[in-house]
C-alpha cells in the first residue's frame, strides 16, 4: 500500500505547517506580481508552500494577518510595503520569522529588504538635471509609505544641490497606480508652461504618464523626459523604454 502522509497530522506532531505567508498590498500592480513570482520561485524547490494575503488597505484583513504573524496560520511571513501607520502588527510577532520588504518606518528587530530609495531618486534627478532640465515634476507614491518619503527626499536633495526651485505645483501625490500617473499627467501636460521632465516614484505611474503624453502627441523623450523607479518588465519592453 502506498502511504500518503496527512498534512494535518504532520502539523500536530511537528508543530510546523510548512507554510510561508506573503502579504502584498494589491494583486493589480506589476510590482506586487513580480514580488509574488520571485517568492514563489524561491519556495518552489523547498518543502514549504506559499500562502498569499492581500491587504486591500482593510483593517479587517489586518486582524487576520495579526493572527498569521502570531503563528496561528503560517511558520514565517514576508510583508511587502507595510504602511508606516500600521506597523504595530510587525511588533506582534513573537517566535515566528518575519521579513519586511521595502519598509522604511520605525525601527523593527526583523530583517528588511529595501531599495536604495533616497540615492536612487537622487541619482535619477541628477541625471535629468544633467540633461538641462530645470522644470522637473515629481510624482510621489503613497506618502504613508517610507519608500515614498525617501524617494521624495532624494528628489528634493538633488534639486536643492543644483540650486533649482522646487515648484510645489509640480509635486503630485500619486498612489503607485497607473491611473494616478495618468490623472496627474493630464493636468500638468495641459498647462501653458509644462514640465520638461517628470520623475515618477514607480514605473507603473510613469507608464500612465507615457500613455497621456502619447495621447497629447508629446514625444517621449524628445519633448518630455520621463523616469520611473522599479525597472518592471513592461517598462523595459515599452517603446520607448523607461
Language-model-detected regions and their locations in the chain:
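Glycosyltransferases and closely related glycan-assembly transferases
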Residues: 89-96, 157, 209-218
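Conserved hydrophobic residues forming the short capping helix/wall of the S-adenosyl-L-methionine
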Residues: 43, 158-159, 189, 213
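N-terminal helix-turn-helix DNA-binding module of bacterial transcription factors
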Residues: 1-18, 153, 159
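Hinge/beta->alpha junction and helix N-cap segments in small-molecule ligand-binding domains
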Residues: 25-34, 52-61, 103, 113-123, ...
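Alpha-helical recognition/docking segments in bacterial nutrient-uptake
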Residues: 15-126, 130, 188-190, 194
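Conserved beta-strand positions in the central sheet of alpha/beta enzyme cores
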Residues: 21, 78, 137-138, 199
